[in-house]
Amino acid sequence: MGAKDYIGSLFLTELIKGLALTGRHLFARKITVQFPEEKTPASPRFRGLHALRRYPNGEERCIACKLCEAVCPALAITIESEQRDDGSRRTKRYDIDLTKCIFCGFCEEACPVDAVVETRVMEYHGEKRGDLYYTKQMLLAVGDRYEAQIAADREADAKYR
């Protein structure tokens, strides 16, 4: 320990530097948002509540390829399909268990027809475990309710896909 280090520790220069740094940040503008009262805008890529989309003619987009079910790391998606008379497949059952879902977005990326999407909706709850088990009809209702926002988000994100 040299003389310079000894004098520096004697006058507590490091402590004074730390207090100066704390003092500068103490009077800086606060950036904390009081969430329920104040809301910040969510990104178009925000991954919230799931939705199933329809084509403009009203037909559901899901072709029952089951890629979303296969790619889901949490095994939160359950799909049962049926063959139609015209040869196409459609879902008979499409369920998402939100208690298992980790909101990774893999289902959205895997879907070849943009049928399953994650919306910006982050405020949903359930009083019982079963309330967070979304069926096909519930997911289609979410998609119908937020279709304008979903379409705008997809358009804003199109150049990155």
Swiss-Prot record:
Domain (4Fe-4S ferredoxin-type): residue spans on this chain: 52-82, 92-121
EC number: 7.1.1.-
A Pfam family matched in the record: Fer4_7
Binding-site residues for [4Fe-4S] cluster 1, renumbered to this chain: C62, C65, C68, C111
Annotated PANTHER family: NADH DEHYDROGENASE [UBIQUINONE] IRON-SULFUR PROTEIN 8, MITOCHONDRIAL, NADH DEHYDROGENASE UBIQUINONE IRON-SULFUR PROTEIN 8, MITOCHONDRIAL
Family: Belongs to the complex I 23 kDa subunit family.
Protein name: NADH-quinone oxidoreductase subunit I
Organism the protein comes from: Aromatoleum aromaticum (strain DSM 19018 / LMG 30748 / EbN1)
